[in-house]
Amino acid sequence: MSSPQLTYYDMGAGVLAFSTMRQGGNSMGNYADFNINNYCGDAPEHIARNRQALAALIGVSEQHIVMPHQTHGTVVCRVDAPPAEVLEGVDAVMTDVKGLCIGVSTADCIPILLYDAEHHAACAVHAGWRGTVQRIVQEAVKQMQTAYCSQPCQLKAVIGPGISLESFEVGDEVYQQFADAGFDMDPIARRYAKWHLDLPQCNRIQLEAVGVRDVWMSDICTYQQYEQYFSARRLGINSGRIYTAIVLK
């Protein structure tokens, strides 16, 4: 078995930040090769071996790999120790504890990592279109301010692999939800045969609106690069998930 392949992000010397790719694991079919998500139908024995491989690669114990069960809401959970049970209904996790690997699962939705170097705190955010329209990334920044005294102007943000404007076709009702929520649609929407939305850009705009200036965009479209990164629109819901995570050193 080859080692898991990761896309790394340079967020500073104090952290390890990455997204998993599809290569280098034990899973099969639409989960091939590397999936560690328990909630998408993959074989438990494959997930277990993949988690072991990831833990060994990044230098943490398996118990320190934190992955919530996401429900497209806006709940941000502070994690101070390895959870004793599933983090149910959580779409963002934050910590200031060294050695905890906090992350979110995506397969077209937008993963966002936040890092506060001054207070050595981090957050991982899952922003699908429902979370984006509810401004979950702004809620995450707010929660980091409350928990760790993080200043938005000092945060670093990475917007990881997700579906691009060119590939994210939506119905009129989804477009209207964004318009009704007060978004300026010109920078984030384009009309082809149907409306297309730019979720990465929408989350970047939200971050900048609350004072986060250091935002790095991966510009990886999961739909177009589905051979390297999982895409539910390409592969179906019963397929693997990307794990985008950050570990405080």
PLM feature spans:
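Active-site microenvironment for binding and transforming phosphate-containing groups
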Residues: 1-249
